[in-house]
């Protein structure tokens, strides 16, 4: 069978001029089932054109889209111990790291960059959810701390884009240590007088929600994002009650005062710039009243 698969079939395909078609050319909308060509999805910032559903956006694409002309300085990835607990579940942790690095072309879940958004200098930190669920381990924690230190030294704001399932279980207590470490880093930035803005994306859960993801001066959220600590199913089983419709979505949190604004992905750079100008007491153009609610909200914060 291997001989047929590895030799005969490729020879026949080459003779007939047939090519193997990648499986991920078409993306299915989770809400409507609509099939979207991957190039069209990428060109629309990973938002389904018809339904407006916000798909998960790769970290590299997020940074390139955020900064002016896609120009920014990538902050270095810190070196930490690899698999210090020699952890193994159904698979070796070292193998999970290797596979995730091949899949995402990243060293770990965090990417950070220094650049300008509509002329305002800032540091942006982005989670890559496809790297072990965007989980927070030693490497991610150290990268976040270093990014906050860079923003403090540059005397500029920091914008966080969390997308995570929480702490990385394969690193045990070493992962949990990153929660207080990142919290201290947030406090140091705030003590320096610089704003800290969080843009909550889908999903933001677990220990990340319990630490730096909910410590911002202003919290924006993308439409339909799942935001919470424990999952909806776990809460229902624990309480033995049915939760409200839309529970743990960004719109539900906005209605209940946990989020300041729900902002479409296309509007995030402009909204961030306008809010940051108010927080840093810089002139704000009012010619375009898009997201004027953000201005009023930030001014009263």
Curated annotation (Swiss-Prot):
It catalyses: N(6)-carboxybiotinyl-L-lysyl-[protein] + acetyl-CoA = N(6)-biotinyl-L-lysyl-[protein] + malonyl-CoA. Pathway: Lipid metabolism; malonyl-CoA biosynthesis; malonyl-CoA from acetyl-CoA: step 1/1. It comes from the Bacteria. Residues 25-294 form the CoA carboxyltransferase N-terminal domain. Gene3D superfamilies: 2-enoyl-CoA Hydratase, Chain A, domain 1. InterPro entries: AcCoA_carboxyl_beta (IPR034733), Acetyl_CoA_COase_Trfase_b_su (IPR000438), ClpP/crotonase-like_dom_sf (IPR029045), COA_CT_N (IPR011762). GO terms for cellular component: acetate CoA-transferase complex. One of its GO terms (molecular function) is carboxyl- or carbamoyltransferase activity. Its EC number is 2.1.3.15. GO terms for biological process: fatty acid biosynthetic process; malonyl-CoA biosynthetic process. PROSITE patterns: COA_CT_NTER. Belongs to the AccD/PCCB family. HAMAP family: AcetylCoA_CT_beta. Acetyl-CoA carboxylase is a heterohexamer composed of biotin carboxyl carrier protein (AccB), biotin carboxylase (AccC) and two subunits each of ACCase subunit alpha (AccA) and ACCase subunit beta (AccD). Component of the acetyl coenzyme A carboxylase (ACC) complex. Biotin carboxylase (BC) catalyzes the carboxylation of biotin on its carrier protein (BCCP) and then the CO(2) group is transferred by the transcarboxylase to acetyl-CoA to form malonyl-CoA. This is Acetyl-coenzyme A carboxylase carboxyl transferase subunit beta. It comes from Rhizobium leguminosarum bv. trifolii (strain WSM2304). The lineage of its organism: Bacteria, Pseudomonadati, Pseudomonadota, Alphaproteobacteria, Hyphomicrobiales. The gene is accD.
């Amino acid at each position: 069978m291997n001989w047929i698969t590895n030799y005969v079939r490729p020879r026949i395909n080459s003779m007939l001029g047939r090519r193997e078609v990648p499986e991920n050319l078409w993306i299915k909308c989770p809400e409507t089932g609509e099939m979207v060509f991957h190039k069209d999805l990428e060109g629309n910032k990973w938002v389904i054109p018809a339904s407006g559903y916000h798909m998960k956006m790769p970290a590299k694409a997020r940074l390139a889209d955020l900064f002016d002309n896609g120009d920014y300085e990538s902050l270095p990835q810190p070196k930490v111990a690899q698999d210090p607990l020699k952890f193994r579940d159904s698979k070796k942790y070292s193998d999970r790291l290797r596979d995730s690095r091949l899949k995402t072309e990243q060293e770990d879940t965090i990417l950070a960059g220094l650049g300008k958004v509509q002329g305002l200098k800032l540091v942006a930190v982005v989670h890559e959810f496809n790297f072990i669920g965007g989980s927070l381990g030693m490497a991610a924690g150290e990268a976040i701390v270093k990014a906050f230190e860079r923003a403090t030294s540059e005397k500029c704001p920091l914008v966080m884009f969390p997308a995570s399932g929480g702490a990385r279980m394969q690193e045990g207590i070493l992962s949990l240590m990153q929660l207080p470490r990142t919290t201290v880093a947030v406090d140091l930035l705030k003590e320096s007088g610089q704003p800290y803005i969080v843009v909550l994306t889908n999903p933001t859960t677990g220990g990340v929600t319990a630490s730096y993801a909910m410590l911002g001066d202003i919290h924006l959220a993308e439409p339909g994002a799942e935001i919470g600590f424990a999952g909806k199913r776990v809460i229902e089983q624990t309480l033995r009650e049915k939760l409200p419709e839309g529970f743990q979505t960004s719109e539900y949190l906005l209605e209940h005062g946990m989020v300041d604004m729900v902002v479409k992905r296309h509007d995030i750079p402009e909204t961030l710039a306008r809010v940051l100008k108010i927080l840093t007491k810089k002139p704000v153009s009012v010619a375009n009243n898009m997201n004027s609610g953000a201005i009023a909200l930030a001014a009263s914060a």
